[in-house]
Amino acid sequence: MRINTKIRYGLRTMVVIASSTGTEGVLQKDIADSQSISVKYLDSIISYLKLKGLIINAQGKRSGYKLARPADQITMLDIYTAFDRIEVVECLNNENLCPRKNHNCKANRYWDSLKTDFTTLLKNKTLSDIMN
């Protein structure tokens, strides 16, 4: 399983925003500069994080960004699923893709267990944990 670039940049963005102590939030340009991410690409990262309700504008349009809730209430699962669903193998999310769906596939149970374990791992790690 690979963690895609949007998830990695999303986490880095969240860490930068969470590290800010000011009330005015962190400007997108400052995040882009500090993380060597193009402003254009970061625009899409910011959109996903806002849509998921993880960040908000600090003081309206053209202001910086801040966390929508405290860092200890934002999990890695929140960040991960802002960009992608957890998919270990395709047949777990779409049983019509599996020709063995009616044959009690033992491998499917293993993949499902792996997905559950990975989800739990993400759910149990907060942004605050990562920063400390």
Residue spans of the language-model regions?
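Short amphipathic alpha-helical interface segments
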Residues: 8-22
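A short alpha-helical element within helix-turn-helix/winged-helix DNA-binding domains
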Residues: 26-36
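Alpha-helical residues within the helix-turn-helix
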Residues: 33, 50-51
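Key DNA-contact positions within bacterial/archaeal DNA-binding proteins
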Residues: 40
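Short, hydrophobic-biased segments on the C-terminal half of alpha helices
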Residues: 46-47
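Beta-hairpin "wing" of winged helix-turn-helix
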Residues: 54-67
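Non-DNA-binding regulatory cores of transcription-related proteins
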Residues: 68-132
